[in-house]
Amino acid sequence: MLRISVMSESEKAIQLRVEGWLVGAWVDELRLQTQAACSQAKTLSLDLEKLWFVDSHGAALLRDLARQNVAQLNCSPFIDQQLKETTL
């Protein structure tokens, strides 16, 4: 299960909280949410404090978002290591 919620939003920025497991179909849901935020020309950041696990597709999405300058905040050491080790 994955929960995505808006933590804060202004004219220029939006911060989403991502909680749970970023796996399977939930990866596409996060992709849709981040695309919607980016399409509004807002700076996007993700609070990953309560993200417990990512599969290889979730890790790939988070790496792609990082390359697009999406800030990833409060990432646990476990998730950080998964992002470094996981390959498709």
Tell me what each language-model feature is:
Residues 1-88:
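STAS-like cytosolic regulatory interaction modules
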